[in-house]
Amino acid sequence: KNLGVTTLPAGLVTSSTGDDTGAWTGTTGTTTTTNGSDQLTIQYTNVTGNKMIDCEGGDVANGDRVVERYFLRQPRTNPTGNAGLVLACDAGRMNSSNVITTPFNGDGNELILNVEQFKIMLGVQKTDGTMSYITPHQYKEPTNTLHNAPIIAVKVGMIVRSDKPLVGDVTPITELTLMGGVNRFAATPKYVRKSYE
């Protein structure tokens, strides 16, 4: 069963292309592909009996309830003027009444540099016990038969590019497929790109 805070502001919940609030495209509203990126928000309780670390490096005491939000944004520093987006994570805490006690609406910690696309699929349990992967938008659609089904897995995909452009007469990759979606890029500047799922 999915537990925890259910009344977060629309901009802080898991979202994908097709949602009313739009796909998450970083704090500037820009993305480097032709498709919008997703945002993943997770909630968990530390039941290990030991101290854990959240995505921003903060201590998570036993019994603490954590909310983490993964999203793309502009980097804090851009000395060359051509920095790509970064995958960032912002962490907060909530109490036993599901009230956020430590806000998590900041710009978070930078985890991975030069991420051009961030996509997620939710693995939900169907009534027959099997699992099916769907987008967050499909999951939140009230007419979908898997609306609010138990989430038992998350599939993550990213397209990452090189830090510096290629030099010389090189034909760049201008199209990559990620989780079934085609992402197109400008032909210049020329970057090495790779998709990960």
Predicted regions located by residue number:
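Short, structured beta-strand segments at or near domain termini in extracellular proteins/domains
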Residues: Y196-E197
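N-terminal pilin/flagellin-like segments and related low-complexity appendage regions
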Residues: K1-P150, G157, D163-V192
